[in-house]
Regions:
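Extracellular glycan-recognition surfaces and repeat-rich motifs
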Residues: 2-33
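Hydrophobic residues embedded in beta-strands of well-ordered beta-sheets
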Residues: 27, 32-34, 112-116, 156
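Secretory/extracellular carbohydrate-interaction modules
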Residues: 36-115
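Extracellular/lumenal carbohydrate-interaction signature centered on repeated Trp-anchored short motifs
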Residues: 54-65, 135-142, 199
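Ligand-recognition surfaces built from glycine- and aromatic
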Residues: 64, 174-213
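Short tryptophan-centered beta-strand motifs in secreted/extracellular beta-sheet-rich domains
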Residues: 65-67, 143-151, 156-158
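Glycine-aromatic-enriched beta-strand/loop faces of beta-sandwich-type recognition domains
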Residues: 95-144, 189
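Short, solvent-exposed beta-strand-to-loop segments that form ligand-recognition rims
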Residues: 161-180
Length: 213
């Protein structure tokens, strides 16, 4: 982890009845695989979420980004059987302050766990978003999926398991940014789903590779 920074700040998804933070202890290496843990608990104001996030020290620009991820589930080891649980986001993305650059591949933990969200932002302007449905019999929480996006001037192409699943030619960032993996909680009837207190969830990451343009 020498080339990465572990986050210890407020997580996304806060509202009047939900607050989340990233904890250093929720980022571990287990048998050579990165594990980001998420827990949720009931507190006086509603729900408290404790997740994990890690970011590269180096900023990356145009090129090919590749990584293998098993989306949030109850699988306590990277090869165990696990189920998705409402109230979580599996995030894989590059990000620069105030979304000057943001290119996301995300998986929700609620009933829409079959979908992959592909989103690009520039300075928090209205995003360019595409939702892709996972192929039947291959769900992102059941095992590792190989994700890739190719970022070139004016275009981003998104791949899952070698198959092109989305192309963006609008709202395409230009500035280099760190790359991040995160696992954070939600408590919403929409994005990510309502919280599930007292159930530990795990996101697993096998590798990350960047090839410059």
């Amino acid at each position: 982890l020498a080339k990465w920074v572990i986050s210890t700040w407020q997580a996304p998804g806060a509202n009047a009845t939900h607050k989340g933070t990233f904890l250093a202890k929720n980022v571990t290496i287990v048998n050579g695989v990165l594990c980001l843990t998420l827990t949720q608990s009931t507190v006086s104001y509603g729900i408290s979420s404790k997740g994990g996030e890690i970011a590269t020290i180096e900023k990356f620009g145009y090129g090919t980004y590749e990584y293998s991820v098993r989306a949030s589930s109850t699988a306590a080891t990277s090869d165990a059987v696990g189920t998705p649980v409402s109230g979580s986001i599996t995030g894989c993305f590059n990000y620069l302050t105030a979304s000057a650059t943001e290119i996301d591949i995300e998986v929700e933990g609620n009933e829409r766990n079959r979908t992959t969200q592909l989103t690009t932002w520039i300075n928090e302007a209205k995003p360019n978003e595409h939702t892709d449905v996972s192929p039947a019999g291959a769900l992102p929480h059941e095992g590792f999926f190989d994700y890739k996006f190719v970022w070139t001037p004016g275009k981003i192409q998104f791949y899952r398991n070698g198959v092109l699943i989305g192309t963006h030619t609008k709202v395409v960032p230009t500035e280099p940014a760190p790359f991040m993996f995160n696992h954070w909680g939600t408590n919403s009837i929409n994005w990510g789903g309502l919280a599930t207190p007292d159930v530990i969830r795990y996101m697993w990451v096998k590798n990350f590779r960047f090839t410059p343009l």
